[in-house]
Amino acid sequence: YRARSAFTLAYRNIRFKGTGGGSEPEGSVDLGQVPFDRLAAYDARHFPAPRPRFLAAWIRQKGTCGRAVLDDNGMITGYGVIRKCRSGYKFGPLFADTPEIAEEIFLTLSAQVPGEAICLDTPEPNAEAVALARRHGMVAVFETARIYTKAIPDLPLAEIFGVTSFEVG
């Protein structure tokens, strides 16, 4: 693969599709209540480069809802965004320290869009992310390859339950 294209395959992403709705668990807060510097720092742990300007614009898009889970000290342990697309809604990013936190954020955001088509793009190596999607009745609709021209970044894939977008990562 690399010899022909100069790209190295890191892993596959899987897009899962389902329907929004359900009960909203308690415990998460609106992203607007989170100090932006903390959000940007948490995001930077899960993406190969700092992206504060992008992130500020991303979470403020029209038709977007973002939630975070905080620990007892007010530190972020997970956050997620769901945004309106041409057809339905897409999660991304969905980053969390544990599968339980990811599930809480997923359920909270899904509850915001009852009856709407929803998509979650998961990195295949995160088996907990794949299980989360399947547990909520989502089905795989297609896959993409995450490729790089240089070194593959050392990202905590076990904490990446939904990529920001296939185009961005």
Regions found by a protein language model. Give the residues of each.
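Short, high-confidence coil segments that cap the C-terminus of an alpha-helix
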Residues: 64, 114-117
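Residues within well-ordered alpha-helical secondary structure of globular protein domains
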Residues: 42-45, 108, 135
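Amide-forming acyltransferase catalytic core, primarily the GNAT-like/NAT-type
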Residues: 4-90, 100
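Conserved acetyl-CoA binding element of GNAT-fold acetyltransferases
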Residues: 87-99, 106, 116
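Conserved acetyl-CoA-binding loop-helix of GNAT-fold acetyltransferases
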Residues: 3-4, 98-111, 131
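Short, flexible, solvent-exposed loop/turn segments with mixed acidic/basic and small polar residues
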Residues: 79-84, 106-112
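Active-site/acyl-donor-binding loops of N-acyltransferases
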Residues: 2-23, 83, 93, 119-169
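Structural motif corresponding to alpha-helix initiation and N-cap regions
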Residues: 52, 103, 126-127
